[in-house]
Amino acid sequence: MKLYYKPGACSLAAHIILNEIGKPYSLEKVDTATKKTETGADYLLINPRGAVPAIEIEPGVVLTQNSAILQYIGDHSDITAFKPASGSLERARLQEALGFCGDLHTAFGGLFAPGLTQDAEKSVHEQIHRRMTQFEEMLSDGKTYWLGDDFTQADAYAAVIMTWAVFKKLDISHHRKAWALREKVMARPSAKRAFQEEGLA
């Protein structure tokens, strides 16, 4: 399996999960501006939408969209929490959490909009605060991770998104439970290794 990624982008979540499952994989960095990979390949021939992540499951077989990729990797692992049974409430809860990660992604993604004016930046910060307040309400003090005692793909995705605030020097640590979740995820060996492999550490 090959992961096409951009350092620090949402593809970092898939990178963390690949490290968690402990099966062989390879990495290929993508320049999303030029749509070229580090080996000089035309990325649009791999993913016509030009976004990361994408995984090449086998030659010519490519999967895109982070939520789908995270679930696919989990389904092909030996980790029970990564692959709740299809049709179960646990699977629906994982999909629900990944769906909310998409909402977080949209809000935080505004931080990277080109030519962001002061007014636009204020609006982005307000959107982030609104989503983070919603996220905070989802997290229970009695749970180790988002969905319970087990680490899941949703934890990795949410933690990566919150890390974008660090990149942009936006303090969101007052969202106490959410920030504690991020810190817990980033302390995992799988996350530390992914940061090193992407040149972020």
Predicted regions and their residues:
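GST-like domain detector, emphasizing the conserved glutathione-binding G-site
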Residues: 1-122
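A generic structural-conservation signal
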Residues: 27, 174, 194-195
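Short beta-strand(s) of the beta-wing in winged-helix/HTH DNA-binding folds
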Residues: 53-56, 146, 192
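Alpha-helix/helix-capping structural signal
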Residues: 68, 189-190
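Active-site-flanking alpha-helical
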Residues: 74, 161-162, 195
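GST-like fold's C-terminal all-alpha helical module
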Residues: 89, 96-97, 101-189
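Terminal-tail/helix-coil boundary detector
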Residues: 196-201
